[in-house]
Amino acid sequence: MDDTTDAFLRELASREGRTLRAQGDGDLGARMWRAVDAALAEYRAVIVVGSDCLGYDAAYLGDAAAALERGFDAVLGPALDGGYVLAGFTRLAPAVFAGMSWGADTVLACQRERFAALGLRWHELPERADIDRAQDLWRLGDAAQALAIGRTSP
């Protein structure tokens, strides 16, 4: 999907001094590879977040950035379902995302194995919930209700 022609996003990018880039073709891994590779050409570190997680805030993102500043090559924000909601990098090894079964409950385990095989040092943040299936929406509703009455939920 190419949202670089969306008027709202173009205005926001212009106002913030940012550049919109098309994701291009391929699976999630190929698209993340291009995004991270391009960002690392300009910046010391990059953090990629999923749009299907409502459970991170400025502190969570700050913890991810702090891990990268402490010298880790990567940081992961695990999802409750076996995937991850956040990935950050200070360096990118070839094939870090290649051949992953995106959407499977083994993505996080596979990513850990890949990091280890590539010699990357990584830090993991606390788990967060994301929204992949209909039942995840029910959990989100339960969490909102719990917050409204003063309890906590993942």
Regions found by a protein language model. Give the residues of each.
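Glycine/proline-rich, flexible active-site/cofactor-binding loop segments
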Residues: M1-G24, V85, R91-P94
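Short phosphate-binding loop-to-helix
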Residues: E11-A45, A104
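Short aromatic-hydrophobic micro-motifs that form the base-stacking/packing surface
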Residues: I47-V49
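Short acidic donor-binding/metal-coordinating loop in glycosyltransferase active sites
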Residues: S51-C53
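Conserved donor-nucleotide/metal-binding helix-loop-beta segment in metal-dependent transferases, i.e.
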Residues: Y56-D81
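Conserved catalytic core of nucleotide-sugar-dependent glycosyltransferases
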Residues: A74-A95, W102
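Short, glycine-/small-residue-rich phosphate/pyrophosphate-handling segment
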Residues: A93-R114
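Conserved alpha/beta core of the MobA/IspD/sugar-nucleotide pyrophosphorylase nucleotidyltransferase superfamily
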Residues: A109-P154
